[in-house]
């Protein structure tokens, strides 16, 4: 049992060290935004979000407005569900559908480890705004970032993850209680897998 705990701890540390350079990339350099007809307007995002989140979406307009003011209009978004749990080290698993205007829709799965001062569990509906996605296959990447949110029962949380100039902004509304700050990454795959690394 101890050997397994050591192996999992070593794997999480390796994953965090691998994700750190991606997290340090920050916002993508300015380089012409995608054509406006391939991006989603704030109204389109709100309509999709209200349909998806339902009655808990009162704060959605404010959180989408904040994301749009920081990163502009996305050229894709993901609607899905996920579950996560942590006590110092954590895991997150999810699945959803990536929507784009000009590259089609795509079923995606995500997994990821995290480590930090973090405890709790949650089940969440997730809307991820996707920026600078050159094609749907480019989503299959590890996106690193720092998560420092408090998830309250029925509340919203927003973070940012980045890899290869693609920015993901997960917006979560869920059931559970999770408090803390952690560093980790999300890995996107075309098929479901239990391997978070």
Label every PLM stretch briefly:
Residues 20-24:
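Sec/Tat signal peptide C-region and signal peptidase I cleavage site
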């Amino acid at each position: 049992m101890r050997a397994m705990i050591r192996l999992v701890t070593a794997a999480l540390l390796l994953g965090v060290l691998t994700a750190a350079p991606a997290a340090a990339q920050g916002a993508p350099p300015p380089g012409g935004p995608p054509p406006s007809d391939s991006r989603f307007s704030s109204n389109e995002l709100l309509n999709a979000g209200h349909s998806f989140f339902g009655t808990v979406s009162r704060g959605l307009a404010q959180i989408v407005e904040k994301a749009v003011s920081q990163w502009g209009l996305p050229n894709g978004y993901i609607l899905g569900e996920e579950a996560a749990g942590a006590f110092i080290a954590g895991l997150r698993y999810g699945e959803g559908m990536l929507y784009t205007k000009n590259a089609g829709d795509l079923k995606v799965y995500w997994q990821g480890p995290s480590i930090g001062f973090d405890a709790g569990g949650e089940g969440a509906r997730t809307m991820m705004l996707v920026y600078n996605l050159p094609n749907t296959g480019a989503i299959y990447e590890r996106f690193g970032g720092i998560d420092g949110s408090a998830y309250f029962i029925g509340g919203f949380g927003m973070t940012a993850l980045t890899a290869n100039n693609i920015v993901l902004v997960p917006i979560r509304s869920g059931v559970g209680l999770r408090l803390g700050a952690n560093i980790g990454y999300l890995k996107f795959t075309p098929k479901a897998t239990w391997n978070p690394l």
